[in-house]
Amino acid sequence: MRAPLLLESRDYLLSEQMPVAVTNRYPQETFVEHTHQFCEIVIVWRGNGLHVLNDHPYRITCGDVFYIQAADHHSYESVHDLVLDNIIYCPERLHLNAQWHKLLPPLGPEQNQGYWRLTTQGMAQARPIIQQLAQESRKTDSWSIQLTEVLLLQLAIVLKRHRYRAEHAHLLPDGEQLDLIMSALQQSLGAYFDMADFCHKNQLVERSLKQLFRQQTGMSISHYLRQIRLCHAKCLLRGSEHRISDIAARCGFEDSNYFSAVFTREAGMTPRDYRQRFIRSPVLPAKNEP
């Protein structure tokens, strides 16, 4: 298998002293699998797409945040008006006496340690910091180099304060509409999602919520739910031995034939063929020479 493309620090950072850079993806196009000589913070502002991080697929949209380590490999596929910022940084160039290890995950061995959601309030606070960071990182004087690190620290603290796991959105004070619906959808991967009941419990207007969701993500709520269910199915197909019919049920599809049809249409191959791509052939012992 061909090694992923390597992105080098010198192509993104203006000097060997500059610790941070910002690359605006307005929009983010399809990008082949790659790895880096640097770390990244990815913040999604609008649209949607498929982000495959270390072979784990995520259907990403407004408010998603990823902490990418240099050795990670990832790609972007099936993008639709996807707008995001990449905040690039080299840990070895950070000199402030800050608790970076508590601010910039991964904090542990969990597979999803690098994936978080960012509240609407957090997005509003982060955006001007990133804009200033982008301006300062284009300069090479010593004051700008120091200021970029200060701004990165400020951004890291804002993200630490306002990031959350999708399954824990109910613990947030004054949960925003988008945060609440995203959390509810993430918890409905294998169960029926009752939109009317959700709106009634949270005192939301269904029509307004649907309009807000489409405006921020570029797709309907039902389409997004189907997409994250398919992403979950891909994870199970490549990482478990469950039968395809069981995987369909675990991903909210009561009819396995319908699941196969939807999966084939979206992935361009059947669930069985998709699974076969990740099954390694056994290595046969070499025959002794006569």
From Swiss-Prot:
Highest taxon, organism lineage: Bacteria
Keywords: Activator, Cytoplasm, DNA-binding, Repeat, Rhamnose metabolism, Transcription, Transcription regulation
Site (Interaction with sigma-70) residue list: 246
The keyword Cell wall biogenesis/degradation belongs to this UniProt entry's keyword annotation: no
Entry keyword Repeat: yes
Limits of the HTH araC/xylS-type domain: 179-277
Localisation: Cytoplasm
One term of GO molecular function: sequence-specific DNA binding
PROSITE patterns the UniProt entry points to: HTH_ARAC_FAMILY_1 (PS00041), HTH_ARAC_FAMILY_2 (PS01124)
GO (cellular component) term, any one: cytoplasm
Annotation: DNA-binding region: 196-217, 244-267
Listed CDD domains: cupin_RhaR_RhaS-like_N
Any single biological process term in GO: positive regulation of DNA-templated transcription
InterPro entries assigned: AraC-bd, Homeodomain-like_sf, HTH_AraC, HTH_AraC-typ_CS, RhaR_RhaS-like_N, RmlC-like_jellyroll, RmlC_Cupin_sf, Tscrpt_act_RhaR
Biological role: Activates expression of the rhaSR operon in response to L-rhamnose.
Subunit structure: Binds DNA as a dimer.
NCBIfam families reported for this sequence: PRK13501.1 (NF010026)
Alphabetized PANTHER family for the sequence: ARAC-FAMILY TRANSCRIPTIONAL REGULATOR, HTH-TYPE TRANSCRIPTIONAL ACTIVATOR RHAR
The protein, known as: HTH-type transcriptional activator RhaR
High-level lineage: Bacteria, Pseudomonadati, Pseudomonadota, Gammaproteobacteria, Enterobacterales
